[in-house]
Amino acid sequence: MWFVMREEEPEPRTMMPETIPWKLLQGIALVQLYREEKWVEPPELDRLPYSLLYHQTMSTLASTGELTPAELAQRVLTLSYFHRVSADDYRALLRHLIKIDHIQVTEGGGLIVGLAGERIINNFKFYAVFQENEEFTVRSESAELGTIVNPPPPGERIAIAGHCWIVEEVDWKRHTVFATQVKGRVPAYFGDCPGDINTHVLERMRKALNEHAVYPYLMGNARARLAQARHTTEISGAGTKPLINLGGDTWVLFPWLGSYAFLALERMLKIKCAAELGLRGLDPSRPYFMQFKMKADEETFFEVLAAEAEKDFDPIELVYPGEVPYFDRYDEYVPEELVRKGFAEGVLDIEGMKQRVLSWRDHA
């Protein structure tokens, strides 16, 4: 087996963070963690899987026929993967499914599959619970720009038709993305959930940059790129300092956090810290680094972040107003308040983010 990491030649004006071979480091980290610790990424068992809850509810009704709400809850909520789902959450889901006719109430008060639900469960793809790649049409005003799969949420940028566009709205029912042209480049968008990377991998990537070990499985070009990256890291201090000034008011933050802790930090910066820090133009390359412009100095940055991390805030505060972050297959049939709750409390790694932020106090 071979890992092949393809890279574009960096342009002369490329900023330091973009010259580091992140995918190469990630590959090294995965191999080393298995060689040293026999470590593989653990399953995530503490999420709020409302999309899967919908699927299990509909498949249970389809296979058993009429059930009372209590009988249905007894069959579904006792499954170990739903241990964090409360009775109130399940009640909200059932009421919503009755409202949209995916479930129907019989004269005797029992529950059966509704007419709209029949169309879903009779589709041959119903039992494929994982999200599939579906094409979305991208439009700007009256013009059709092309198609993409798995669109990013509003506020993210995409590259299509030779230009950079910011996503304004995603119509999940019509499979349409509405976008506006903007200047600039497009940072890598890795999605909010699929293909997530554990914090342990990022920490091993940092160690690979800071140590001088030679990995015998690397080919010549990979060894050369690693040596170059280690030299860049040593000169810039990126391996030991989380915040680096790139000149003027431009900064880069290396959190060395996994996908969901990184996403939580990004949102805390934008929602809770941006005004006090004079922070703007935050440009993430998840989950490796984020660049931004900031009026505050380094000491103030760490002080403000630590102050926010010490607060016991509600996770839902890190979800933007009006945002409904769909990313699982059946999220569109789940009540919006549960989709938001599932993302805030089941996806974002707020505790992991807080621990890392508070560990930066020595840099303040």
Predicted feature locations:
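C-terminal accessory/connector segments of nucleic-acid motor ATPases
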Residues: 38-164, 170, 245-260, 272-285
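Terminal, basic amphipathic appendages of nucleotide-handling enzymes
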Residues: 3, 133, 171-245, 298-364
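A generic structural motif
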Residues: 111, 175-180, 280-303
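C-terminal helical accessory/scaffold domains
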Residues: 222-223, 227-233, 239-272, 292
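Amphipathic alpha-helical transducer elements in NTP-driven molecular machines
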Residues: 17, 21-28, 51-54, 87, ...
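Conserved, well-folded catalytic cores of nucleic-acid-processing
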Residues: 4-7, 30-37, 60-64, 79, ...
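Short, surface-exposed beta-strand/loop "edge" segments at domain boundaries and coil↔beta transitions
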Residues: 9-10, 144-147, 187, 253-265, ...
